[in-house]
A protein has these predicted regions:
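Conserved active-site alpha-helix within GNAT-family acetyltransferase domains
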Residues: 95, 119-138
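Acidic/polar helix N-cap motif
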Residues: 8-11, 85, 121
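Conserved acetyl-CoA binding element of GNAT-fold acetyltransferases
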Residues: 75-86
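Conserved GNAT acetyl-CoA-binding A-motif
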Residues: 106-117
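Conserved acetyl-CoA pyrophosphate-binding loop and the N-cap/start of the following alpha-helix
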Residues: 88, 92-100
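Extreme N-terminal starter segment of soluble prokaryotic enzymes
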Residues: 2-3
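Acetyl-CoA-dependent GNAT
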Residues: 6-74, 98, 104, 135, ...
Length: 144
């Protein structure tokens, strides 16, 4: 059975390899200090929130999410990071994490729950197409 719970201090050793795996998947390298800062923010649970998915007591998936204001409605929930260990894929871990975030969003009174992925991430998109609706938006990033 998949167990989902908020990240806690004792989860650091299980969280970090998955966080690094997630960043590697998106071809992003970060300094160790960034992982430390992110971990502190996740554990504080004020600005960003983190979940761990466990199978047989081992952390095999993580989700990071946050709530933010929206111009025309109440707050919304954004799932920023979702990653499942390769050996645990296809076992419902990502779905369980998404559903747990959806429940947190409902409990908080959010009116929308959304996330993004790379256009070519076919494996993830196959899941997302089953459990959510693609809204057709295209994202642009402006350099700062």
């Amino acid at each position: 059975m998949i167990e989902i719970a908020p990240l806690r201090e004792a989860d650091r050793a299980g969280w970090e390899p998955l966080a690094r795996g997630y960043k590697a998947f998106y071809e992003t390298e970060l300094p160790d200090a960034r992982y430390e800062e992110t971990w502190r923010l996740l554990i504080a649970g004020e600005r960003i929130h983190g979940l761990a998915a466990r199978l047989d007591g081992q952390i095999v998936g993580i989700a990071h999410y946050l709530f933010h204001a929206q111009t025309w409605s109440a707050d919304v929930c954004y799932l920023q990071d979702l990653f499942t260990a390769p050996e645990a894929r296809g076992r419902g871990v990502a779905t369980a994490l998404i559903e747990h975030v959806a429940e947190a969003a409902r409990a908080r009174g959010a009116v929308k729950f959304y996330w993004m992925t790379k256009e070519g991430n076919r494996t993830a998109r196959a899941l997302y197409d089953r459990i959510a609706r693609f809204k057709g938006f295209v994202r642009y990033d402006h350099p700062l």
